[in-house]
């Protein structure tokens, strides 16, 4: 299936059955063991990223584009820390949930939320972040997407993806990588060397990396800055 069909599938999923499932996973209510494991893994990735940005000590001076923001798990704490955040997602329902969560915390104007495809994002930002989104893109589409996101980043681009390793490929094939009850869209893995090569071709150098592994959640994260 081509990239357009994948995108349509993702949009429809996260605006229908997937919305309630992932809203609960990215919340703090009761969930099943698999969903709790995924929640824990995703939060570890978010916490690692927040730690990286906080270490720089300039969050209140930078703009951040959270591309594929979901329900605002990253956008909201970034705004609370002082960053000016533009948050977008392909799912109208996910964006609506993100707005509600932000406003419940008194964040009325920051983050700025928008329903938008990654391909349609424009503007310039100090930092562009794309967490756990490339899993929806096959390799050729992911390369094009990374190039596009790189064009928006004035200083830094941070990506996370499901790494393509022998072990994880085997796990995926036997149905343990993304269990049916928790994920029903296609799950694409990517080689870290391919991601790094694209970043370097766009004039970026990898500065930091991290790996989050739980039983059902695997995410490799790379931070790259312009040379």
Language model regions located:
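A conserved beta-strand element that flanks and buttresses the S-adenosyl-L-methionine
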Residues: 129
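A short His-aromatic
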Residues: 136-137
